[in-house]
């Protein structure tokens, strides 16, 4: 009986493994990021943000794309924000969510900050992941890609001035019952750095962080994961707080730390395309696709 069950599990997984056997292209993800950065700064109310939103609409024009527009109360007054949700249906009853934020820092609106690693790289990552999902009904859970608006603080980071898009969507999905269907929420942030070193996030769900590390080991990428840990406040938090098993896949150490850049290139005009690496995006993409497979096997 045990042998039969094992064989059945293997046979059930074969279509999923075969369907995702095509190699993830970090080069394609980087090209998507380049096109996204070409929109310019993407802060609320900017032409660059409108360009970025139109870019996402164009990329997902033939997919099941939903715009989630709402008005957020911010320290500078009401602001209209828009999340994007792209649904790829699966045969199993449940949802895996892969997410990123796509806008840039509002307080840096008078600088040349374009968030190449902070928003654009992860947008490129999800766009390339979409190429591995579309065109068929997935054999496992449905996979939803979410692009959050309003992750950044409008004035100064606090519980009420940050994570606007994720707080809104988590609350909305709690009311309509979507949260109960989520088997895993995987957030991507700052993962295009040439010197990739993903941090273990202690504010995430330990079991899902463990699953991501297992995916890194299975894909031969463990050397880039979890050498250190940090208690990050990020778009996973509103979901963790509502009981959704979640991971935050983030490289918090970005660029040299010196007197001029105490936080490295994070939130500086130096966060530019030349700091990104197709190899790092390939590593991240492989781990995300393997994490989907592992979640489906659970």
Which ranges hold each PLM region?
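A non-catalytic alpha/beta surface segment that caps or lines the substrate-entry region
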Residues: 31-91
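Active-site-adjacent substrate-binding region
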Residues: 48, 69-73, 184, 191-298
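Structural recognition of the beta-strand scaffold that forms the well-ordered cores
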Residues: 35, 85, 95-99, 144-147, ...
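Acidic/histidine-rich catalytic neighborhood of metal-dependent amide-processing enzymes
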Residues: 113-214, 223, 228-236
């Amino acid at each position: 009986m045990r042998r039969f069950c094992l064989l059945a599990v293997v046979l059930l997984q074969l279509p999923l493994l075969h369907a995702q056997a095509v190699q993830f292209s970090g080069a394609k993800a980087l090209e998507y990021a380049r096109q996204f950065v070409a929109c310019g700064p993407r802060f609320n109310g900017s032409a660059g943000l409108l360009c970025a939103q139109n870019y996402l609409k164009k990329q997902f024009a033939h997919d099941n794309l939903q715009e989630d527009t709402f008005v957020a109360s911010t320290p500078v007054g009401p602001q209209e924000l828009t999340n994007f949700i792209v649904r790829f249906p699966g045969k199993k009853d449940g949802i895996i969510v892969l997410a990123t934020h796509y806008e840039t820092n509002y307080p840096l609106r008078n600088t040349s900050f374009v968030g190449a690693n902070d928003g654009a790289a992860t947008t490129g990552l999800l766009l390339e992941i979409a190429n591995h999902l579309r065109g068929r009904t997935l054999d496992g859970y449905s996979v939803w890609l979410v692009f959050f608006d309003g992750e950044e603080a409008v004035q100064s980071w606090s519980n009420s001035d940050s994570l606007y898009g994720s707080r809104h969507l988590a609350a909305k999905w709690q009311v309509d019952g979507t949260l109960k269907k989520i088997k895993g929420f995987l957030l991507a942030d700052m993962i295009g750095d040439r010197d990739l070193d993903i941090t273990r996030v202690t504010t995430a769900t330990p079991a899902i962080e463990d699953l991501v590390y297992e995916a890194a080991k299975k894909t031969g990428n463990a050397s880039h994961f979890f050498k250190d840990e940090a208690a990050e406040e990020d778009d996973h938090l509103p979901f963790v707080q509502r009981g959704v098993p979640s991971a935050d896949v983030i490289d918090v150490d970005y660029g040299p730390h010196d007197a001029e850049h105490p936080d490295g290139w994070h939130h500086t005009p130096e966060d530019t395309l030349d700091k990104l690496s197709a190899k790092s995006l390939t590593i991240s993409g492989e781990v995300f696709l393997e994490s989907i497979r592992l979640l489906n096997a659970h």
